[in-house]
Amino acid sequence: EFLEQSDIISSLNPSSLNTLRVVSYLNNEGVHILASVLRIGKFGSTTDNFSTGGLFCGILENGRLKGKGYNPNGDILTKTSTGILLEDCEIPNYKKVHEMAKSMHYIVPYFKIISWDIAINKNNMPVLIEYNTNKQGIDLQIAAGPLFGKFIDEILEIGRESH
């Protein structure tokens, strides 16, 4: 059995399960989304990993992809290997993706920062693939911007207190 991804997401590269990496941060005020990128596999690849030649593209708050994607060679790409312009793509049910990540973070509150790998299924609904509690990856900042944003001082203080 395997997950069938959304037609929209599959059109970007049908050979891999293309996933969203959503990074959330939990503090006393609640859960905040720090960054979101879409990871798209290299043409013919079965994985969407950046390290295996895939690309990633930042996602705007409305669910549309930013117009530029990045691969591990440092190339700036405006379309996928299937010819889809990144700026023309919108993630289905993007608001639900954020809601899902936020609600799941409360289940594991002992981790302050979590990276969620989420796919969009054939019914355009988010599905959790896995979550990562360390090594969030500095790479995604290339596409999404500074990871900690307005929380940088707060997060750095947590790091200082733990050492």
Model region roles, listed by residue range:
Residues 1-3, 13-17, 35-36, 93-99, ...:
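A short linear-motif detector with a strong N-terminal bias
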Residues 1-69:
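Phosphate-binding site of ATP-dependent enzymes
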Residues 115:
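Flexible, glycine/charged-enriched surface loops at secondary-structure junctions
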